[in-house]
Amino acid sequence: MSFLDSYRKKTLMPSTDEALPGRAQPIPTSATHFVNSRPLKEPWPEGYKQVLFGMGCFWGAERLFWQVPGVYVTAVGYAGGVTPNPTYEETCTGLTGHAEVVLVVYDPKVVSLDELLTLFWEEHDPTQGMRQGNDIGTTYRSVIYTFDKADRDVAEKSREAYSQALAGRGLGPITTEIEDAPELYYAEDYHQQYLAKNPNGYCGLRGTGVSCPIPLAQ
């Protein structure tokens, strides 16, 4: 298989027939956050909200958000594809359809969705389609998955605002997928808070250098 054929295969979403079968049972993962010891799974404190972000390799993306004041907990996983309960190795084949994502659970009284979206847009390149830098494939695509219509509307308005900012610098168009949140399949234990466990590990986050013009709530 040529490099071009391999590239095309990794950047095409698999059909239901092509996707790997996966498994009925979730793969084992951590119960608590390595950094703050909070539980990685629901129930969350009353009034807290959640959002899923995909912005390339999930190691660096998760570290970006767990450091934000008002973020209660983060976790990494796979979402947006076909294969149930996939492994990391399976997602790397491109035959699950899943993106690497970060679950961000936050207190909206402390940090707003707009503030989280500003970080999302500014800290990666949302114009690259099925890749992020040297990381190539559907698993590295840019995504925002929201848990209610109001948050989806906020995300879509932010995409429009950032699209205009990018266009003003001769960049774009944005390829970020914004959808209602699908099922999240938690990644393996060793991926959770990876850069806290491995401080010198790989982080592929690279922004465009264009500031996001979302007006933030005062």
Curated annotation (Swiss-Prot):
It holds the Pfam family PMSR. Transmembrane segments: none annotated. Induction: Induced by phenol and 4-chlorophenol but not by hydrogen peroxide. It catalyses: L-methionyl-[protein] + [thioredoxin]-disulfide + H2O = L-methionyl-(S)-S-oxide-[protein] + [thioredoxin]-dithiol; [thioredoxin]-disulfide + L-methionine + H2O = L-methionine (S)-S-oxide + [thioredoxin]-dithiol. Its EC number is 1.8.4.11. Keywords: Oxidoreductase. One of its GO terms (biological process) is protein modification process. Active on the S and R isomers of MetO. NCBIfam families: msrA. HAMAP family: MsrA. This is Peptide methionine sulfoxide reductase MsrA. It comes from Brucella anthropi (Ochrobactrum anthropi). The lineage of its organism: Bacteria, Pseudomonadati, Pseudomonadota, Alphaproteobacteria, Hyphomicrobiales. The gene is msrA.
